[in-house]
């Protein structure tokens, strides 16, 4: 039986996973993303290389005890290794809180943050898990920061598309 999932456990799990660090193929290093890629059977380490921030979030959610399939019915576009799928999932399941990025009062540790136009000029291009909220800044555990996991400080600005809060004890049904 899995432990009861909480936002607090998700923030702690994400912090630990970010500091591991996980990484794709780097000069002189083979990828260690196998635990992150494994749940997605049609995805290889080479295909995931440089494209795994959403899979990192999924890995952290599962490790924290959240029971979520790789492709919930709410996900129309792709499975949860894609950022857009997390938005579809949150907006399609009324138990999950979805708040637009301009709602700066909402985010707290353990929330998922979706970004627009962080690495490329596209919506839904990156995501992570909030570990700490400061006044106008978020401390976020992210996968795929230059193909590595890590902790990063991000301003609460127009790049934030939305915040997602999975309720404590959530199980997909």
Specify the residue positions occupied by each region the protein language model found.
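N-terminal capping segments
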Residues: 1-71
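Intrinsic disorder/low-complexity segments
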Residues: 12-15, 82, 86, 159, ...
